[in-house]
Amino acid sequence: MTAPEQTYRNKKQRKQQHKLRRPGYAIAKYVRMSPRKVRLVVDVIRGKSVAEAEDLLRFIPRAASEPVAKVLKSAKSNAINNDEMLEDRLVVAAAYVDAGPTLKRLLPRARGSANIIKKRTSHITIIVAERESLSRKGS
């Protein structure tokens, strides 16, 4: 087997293992919103049950709650359909926001100068998992 074939097989195996490690996840990339503003919303739902997180997102008066709700809905659907998890036992195991590429625009100013306006983007990642059974009172 030649070296390129070996590398391809390793990449493919690595990708499959990577998928196995993260059941019930969803990512929204290049969301045209500042990561700082999206983190305010994501911090509220982290660790909550999925049903409670959906209710919270419905009433949070921030623009970032809409894309976060979409990602949460997608992660929930992935967990139920692809990973065969139970809907009523799902919790938000991890939720984080990374900065995407920044679009730079010029704003003309006085005397021929210009300021740079940074239009920031975000990558929103939400991972849901099943809640551990809490019926271990006897042990």
Swiss-Prot record:
Compositionally biased residues, Basic residues: 9-21
Single GO biological process annotation from the record: translation
InterPro entries registered for this protein in UniProt: Ribosomal_uL22, Ribosomal_uL22_bac/chlpt-type, Ribosomal_uL22_bac/org-type, Ribosomal_uL22_CS, Ribosomal_uL22_sf
Function, in words: This protein binds specifically to 23S rRNA; its binding is stimulated by other ribosomal proteins, e.g. L4, L17, and L20. It is important during the early stages of 50S assembly. It makes multiple contacts with different domains of the 23S rRNA in the assembled 50S subunit and ribosome.
Complex formation: Part of the 50S ribosomal subunit.
PANTHER family, alphabetized: CHLOROPLAST 50S RIBOSOMAL PROTEIN L22-RELATED, LARGE RIBOSOMAL SUBUNIT PROTEIN UL22M
Protein name (database record): Large ribosomal subunit protein uL22
